[in-house]
Amino acid sequence: MKAKGRILLLTSCLFLLLLLLAKIHLRRRLDVITTTDWLAPVIWEGTFDRKVLEKYYHKQNITMGLTVFAVSSFNGQYLDPFLQSASKFFMPGYRVIFYIMVDKSLKLPEMGHNPLQSFQVLVVSQERQWSDFDLMRMTVLSKHIREHIRFEVDFLFVMSVNMVFQNVFGVETLSTSVAQLHAWWYFRKTTHLPYERRPTSAAYIPFGLGDFYYAGAIIGGVPFQVLDFTHQYLKSVILDIENGVNSTYEKYLNKYFFLNKPTKLLSPEYSWDQTFNIPQQVHYVKVAHYPTDDL
């Protein structure tokens, strides 16, 4: 998978470059940002041609991975709608492995048989008490990517469990490093973005700097890129603990993408907070992000 991944990455980059030069991949939408300053595409409905992308990716014999954590009875209640909707809308027509991280044995919901989909239920060790959910999540994720996920899939997404897919989440989202734009902060002035502003924290971004504010609900890319994020996150958290500082997962995520620019950004359509009114820029909500008491 490692050698295959490198070849796939090179061919993907070449193909997308050709599409860009041919003005096929990115269509114009004047009401939203469709390309970043570092030339990464921002994916909105109407900015891509799925038929062209499908024609390419169906020839690549690729496997997608989707990881979700449901490690308590509280989170477990959201798992059924997540899996039911993901099995319908996440990468339809492609091989998908769902990695479901739980803290106890779990019976999967009844779903229609799909020979392209498989499920791995991975029990999180309870040998130690985790006081920080995100620290646990990234530690466990890093372990499983190293041990087996990187050999099993070509692209990997990690998502929050309190999400419901409403439209196709397809191959237009694939890239080396994928970040999700925050549904609220995308429509706000960059001077107000809630980065970590304390210089003592490893998540620190100085005033006047920063590109976008990214949501922690979705991160994706090729496995080694997701693994790199988990390593950098854990390194930053440990450094802050040693210095007596405490920041948040989302702020560490934003610092990572500030230093390591994502190669593709997903518009707020791919993680829309259901408590917000839908603006005219959002044509279709691909994935609805619900508060943890609304499902």
Predicted segment positions?
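A conserved donor-nucleotide-binding helix/loop in the catalytic core
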Residues: S125-V158, N246-F257
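Short coil/turn segments at secondary-structure boundaries
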Residues: L79-L83, M111-P115, L135-M136, F169-E172, ...
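Short, polar loop motifs at secondary-structure junctions
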Residues: M101-K107, N162-M163, Y270-S271
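Acidic, glycine-rich loop-and-strand cores that form catalytic or ligand-binding grooves
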Residues: F169, Q180-L193, G216-Q232
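N-terminal anchoring/stem segment of glycosyltransferases
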Residues: K2-F133, H144-F151, D294
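Catalytic core and acceptor-binding pocket of nucleotide-sugar-dependent glycosyltransferases
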Residues: S201-T292
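Structural signal for hydrophobic/aromatic residues that build the beta-strand cores
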Residues: L66, A86, F98, L141, ...
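GT-A fold catalytic core of metal-dependent nucleotide-sugar glycosyltransferases
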Residues: M138-K189
